[in-house]
């Protein structure tokens, strides 16, 4: 898996202070997407064990209390990303108790395959659905267009 950007302290992409990871790779290619540079799976830089360790360390850093992590992109549930995202989410669950995990995907919840559902079964919130420019609404919280749904899973 590749990623484009990692923010160790973020107050924009989810509730509270959190970490945010923007991964590479998206098959949806939504017109009007604000993150077109993340569409190609080989763009950005490789997601390494060192980066994974950094995220775990940041989530557990007591100097800056973080509520959790936001995983966006690109699409964290892109088939090529799922193995690494699953491993990361499993580590967060095991090593960062009490941290919430939010995932944004262009897929709809009812379209997800078994591998993608392994990730979803471990997260707190899934924001699903493609961005639809004609349904864009800047007043919406945590989503860009009114067709997208915020699923509070746990």
UniProtKB/Swiss-Prot annotation:
UniProt KW keywords: 4Fe-4S, Cytoplasm, Iron, Iron-sulfur, Metal-binding, Oxidoreductase, S-adenosyl-L-methionine
GO cellular component: anaerobic ribonucleoside-triphosphate reductase complex
InterPro entries, per the entry: Aldolase_TIM, NrdG, Organic_radical-activating, Radical_activat_CS, rSAM
Top-rank EC class of the record's enzyme: oxidoreductase
Residues annotated to bind [4Fe-4S] cluster: 26, 30, 33
SUPFAM superfamilies cross-referenced by the UniProt entry: Radical SAM enzymes (SSF102114)
Record-stated family: Belongs to the organic radical-activating enzymes family.
Principal location class: cytoplasm
The organism's taxonomic lineage, starting at the top: Bacteria, Pseudomonadati, Pseudomonadota, Gammaproteobacteria, Enterobacterales
Membrane-spanning segments: none
Protein name: Anaerobic ribonucleoside-triphosphate reductase-activating protein
Cofactor binding description: Binds 1 [4Fe-4S] cluster. The cluster is coordinated with 3 cysteines and an exchangeable S-adenosyl-L-methionine.
Complexes and interactors: Monomer or homodimer. Forms a tetramer composed of two NrdD and two NrdG subunits.
Induction details: Induced 2-fold by hydroxyurea.
